Every structure is written in C-alpha cells, then in structure tokens.
A protein has these predicted regions:
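Surface-exposed loop/turn motifs in large extracellular/passenger domains
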Residues: 1-13, 21-43, 51-73, 81-107, ...
Length: 173
C-alpha cells in the first residue's frame, strides 16, 4: 500500500483480524507513507496493528517526507505501527521513520507502540528512526497496557518502541 502526495485519510478501521491500514488476518502488511500525506486515525481490528500487519502478520512500514500520523492505535495485541499478534511465529515490525515526519502511535494491550505485536515468538523486527540534514522526526510512542488472561494472571505491557509482551499464564506479578 502506498500513500503519497497530499493524500489525507480521515479514518481507517480494521475489521476482525485486519489492520487499519495494511494486512488482513494472517496477512503481512507493507505500507509506504510519504510526501505530505496525513493519516488522521488508523485503528487496528482485534489482534492487528493500526498500520502494518494483520492478526498473525508482520508489518513493514516506511514513513518519510513530511508525512503526519496523528493516531495509529493497535487493536488488542497489535502494535500501533508494526506487527499484529504473532501467535509465536510472526508479529514483527520492520519500521523506518525519517525526515520531517510526525508520528503518534499506541500499542494495543501488551504490544509495542512502534514495533512488535504480542507473542512475536522471540522474533525481532528492525526499527530505524533518523533525521536528515534538514529535519528530524517527532515520534510519540506508547506501549500497550498489561495483559490479563482472565484467570488473574497479568503479564507485562508492551514497550513504547520495541517489542510486545509474551503472554504466559505462568507469569505472576
């Protein structure tokens, strides 16, 4: 998916298992956002990234130029920008943010704001944030809140930038 020029996306909402912008359930999402593009809101469906991979999918996302992401929010277990829920085999985020961009991302429960979804199976993506000679990105990333499995076990929350948690019913605080 390429979003470029002066494109404005007011709202993109993923259905069950689908990213707001990117892959569907069991699908990888490759998304390029550049130019003066603006994403006002991208919300992942259950287990999916706001921008990137669907449930059990990896996300490869490039944001450059003067692009603005006002709000990228992962669904439960999905990164704001990056991978969806990994099911122990996927869910990684390969992310590049550069130039005069502004990015705001929040992970779903247990997931990274920018990076991996929950249960990426020890797989790690590559995250690059870099300026140019003329400007540098403004990035606000918030990891998802702690995960509870319904039996009273609480796992860790996700990193702002990096990896999501690995749910484990044997984990106790």
């Amino acid at each position: 998916i390429k979003i470029t020029g002066d494109a404005v996306i007011k709202s993109a909402v993923g259905g069950g298992g689908g990213a707001g912008i990117g892959g569907g359930q069991w699908g990888n999402g490759t998304v390029t956002i550049s130019g003066d593009s603006k994403i006002e809101s991208a919300l992942g469906g259950g287990l999916s990234a706001g921008i990137g991979g669907g449930a059990v999918g990896n996300g490869t996302v490039s944001i450059s130029g003067n692009a603005t992401i006002e709000n990228a929010q992962g669904g439960k277990d999905g990164a704001g920008i990056g991978g969806g829920y990994g099911y122990g085999q996927s869910g990684t985020g390969d992310i590049t943010i550069e130039g005069n961009t502004t990015v705001n991302a929040t992970g779903g429960m247990g997931s990274a704001g920018i990076g991996n979804g929950t249960d990426a199976g020890g797989n790690n993506g590559q995250i690059t944030i870099r300026g140019t000679k003329d400007s540098s990105p403004t990035v606000n990333a918030t990891g998802g809140i702690a995960e509870e499995d319904g039996q009273g076990y609480v796992g860790p929350g996700g990193a702002g930038i990096g990896v999501g948690s690995t749910t484990d019913s044997e984990y106790t605080p």
